Amino acid sequence: MREETKKFIEDRQPHAAKPLKVVSVKLVGGKRPNDCSNNALDVVDEMDRVRPITGWLVNPLNPLTGEVEILAHWWNADAKGNHFDTTPCLYNEAEYVEDLDLYTFAHKNYDAIESIVASSLKYKNGVYIACESNLKEIRTITERSISSLANKELFKL
C-alpha cells in the first residue's frame, strides 16, 4: 500500500462505520466509460451472486502538481469475494479502497442527494477538495471546499 493510500484511509476511517481496506480488483472493462455506478448495478442484474462495491481509486502522488487524485468509484465482487471492474479505466496505477459506507449512505439518502456516486477528491498540502464533473461536459470539473471526509460532505447533503 502506498503512503497516499494509507494517509487517505487514516483520514476517512473515522467517518466510516465499516472498515476501509485495499482490495485487489481485476480490470475487466466492457461497459460504459464514466458510468461506474450504473455499470456495477447492471452487472448485479446480469449475474448471479454478485454485489456492487463502493470505494475509491487512490492514484499515486503527481510529482508535477503535488496532488493526489482520489476518485469515488463503484465496481463488483462475486460471492467468493473476487473483485472486478467492468468500467473502462485509464487509472491502472490506482489502488482500490473498499468503502461500503458510501453505498449505505447513498441508499439511505437516495432522494436527497444529486448522485449515488460520492464526490471525487483532490489532496494537496494536507487539504482535501471535493471535485465534481459534469458528465455532459466531461472536461468541466467544479471544486468545492469540504470540512471533513464525512459522508454528508462527500455527497453534498
What are these regions (language model features)?
Residues M1-L157:
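A structural boundary/capping signal
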